[in-house]
Each structure stands twice: as C-alpha cells, then as structure tokens.
Swiss-Prot record:
It holds the Pfam family DMRL_synthase. This is 6,7-dimethyl-8-ribityllumazine synthase. GO terms for cellular component: riboflavin synthase complex. Its EC number is 2.5.1.78. It comes from the Archaea. NCBIfam families: lumazine-synth. InterPro entries: LS, LS/RS, LS/RS_sf. It catalyses: (2S)-2-hydroxy-3-oxobutyl phosphate + 5-amino-6-(D-ribitylamino)uracil = 6,7-dimethyl-8-(1-D-ribityl)lumazine + phosphate + 2 H2O + H(+). Catalyzes the formation of 6,7-dimethyl-8-ribityllumazine by condensation of 5-amino-6-(D-ribitylamino)uracil with 3,4-dihydroxy-2-butanone 4-phosphate. This is the penultimate step in the biosynthesis of riboflavin. HAMAP family: Lumazine_synth (MF_00178).
C-alpha cells in the first residue's frame, strides 16, 4: 500500500496575499494586522495588499470579491468581536465565521478565519500582542494553505 502525505510549507516565495481587516476595535485589529504582516515579511511573501473595512461583519463580502479576482493565493480575514450587553456579539461572530468559510468554499481560494471573539478587551489584548499575536499564527495558516493548494 502506498500512503502519500501532502502538506503546505511556510514559505512565501511567489505568493500574493490579501488581508481584510476590520477597523472597529482598531486597538486590537491593528496589532493582529502587524503580526500578520510581520509573518508574511519574515517568510518572503512577495506582495501583501491590505483592505480595511468598517467592522468584522463587512469582511466576508470583500474576502469573497478578492478571492474571485484571481490575484491572491490566500485571503486572511482579521477582526475582533468583543461581547457586549446585547445579542449583537453572537450574531456578528456567527455570521462572520459562516461568511468567511463560504467565501473560501465558493471560490476555491483559502480564506483564513482570523476573527477573534472575546469576552472583553483584556482577552483581546492577550491574543493580539501581550501574550501572543494570533495575527502571526493566522498568517502562518494562510502560508500553509496557499502552498498546499499549489500541490493539488
């Protein structure tokens, strides 16, 4: 029996990436964006285009449009949704995750879900730079998926 394993590498040679980032909660999203750009720079990505949208809810439509353009090997969606006193948090978090997943499935281009849903700003700060930077981690996933797709 032959078993073949395929895996994407963490290299940016020849890759073009798009980042869609929400401006809402920019104290946190700016840190996620910095982490992602740092990752792409360290791994030699040739081109990164950043698209800023008002909030996380607006991410999926832009991610889908960018994926359809054929210009990018992967799209990275970055945002922060902080729980408040209303159901708005649940609605936004659920719809954004569905929309980002659909954008990738419909277009066949990896669209990485980098929207963090947190209980409060402190949790957000812990994920966007104080303890670690999830933006860097999500960018690593984008690299891996873009390279894996090239093998298929």
């Amino acid at each position: 029996m032959e078993v073949r394993v395929f895996e994407g590498e963490f290299k940016g040679d020849g890759l073009s990436m798009a980042i869609v980032v929400a401006r809402f909660n920019d104290l946190l999203t700016d840190e996620l964006l910095s982490g992602a750009i740092d990752c792409f720079e360290r791994h030699g990505v040739e081109r990164v285009d950043v698209f800023k949208v008002p909030g996380s809810f607006e991410i999926p439509i832009i991610a889908k449009k960018l994926a359809e353009s054929g210009k990018y090997d992967a799209i990275l969606a970055l945002g922060v949704v902080v729980r408040g006193e209303t159901k708005h948090f649940d609605l936004v978090a659920n719809e954004v995750s569905k929309g980002v997943a659909q954008a990738g499935l419909i277009t066949g281009v990896p669209v990485i879900f980098g929207v963090i849903a947190v209980e409060d700003e402190l949790q957000g700060l812990n994920r966007a730079g104080i303890k670690s930077n999830k933006g860097f981690e999500y960018a690593m996933a984008a690299l891996e998926m873009a390279n894996l797709m090239k093998k298929l």
